Amino acid sequence: MGFLSEYNAKLTSAETAVKCVKSGDWVEYTSNLGFPAACDLALSKRRDELKGVKIRGDLIFGPIQVIECDPEMEHFVYNTWHCSGYERKMCDKGRAFFEPMVFRNLAWYYKNFLTSDVCMVTVSGMDDD
């Protein structure tokens, strides 16, 4: 199987991709422009199926749909490593949490005490070659 065939065989919709998220999972969002907007929207639509899903991201300019759809944070709890203006407003309103960290220690945190169940990453499409 060539790379392009393998790539095409693995393509899926955001709605299908987020079906792997279960209640209580830790979900990682990438930061800044890597924010997985399509998966965030698809996950927010599963709100009533899920409880206590914890999400980590940082410097996401917003809006973040899992925050917007669940003001009481019964279904989704969003945590940010570093606040964008939008995330700071959400933290100030009690709708998100700030988790201070030092970037150089992040790999150590995951190696020694953090766990993740799902990671959502925005990537570019493959080259035609």
How would you label these PLM feature ranges?
Residues M1-D129:
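Conserved alpha/beta enzyme-core scaffold
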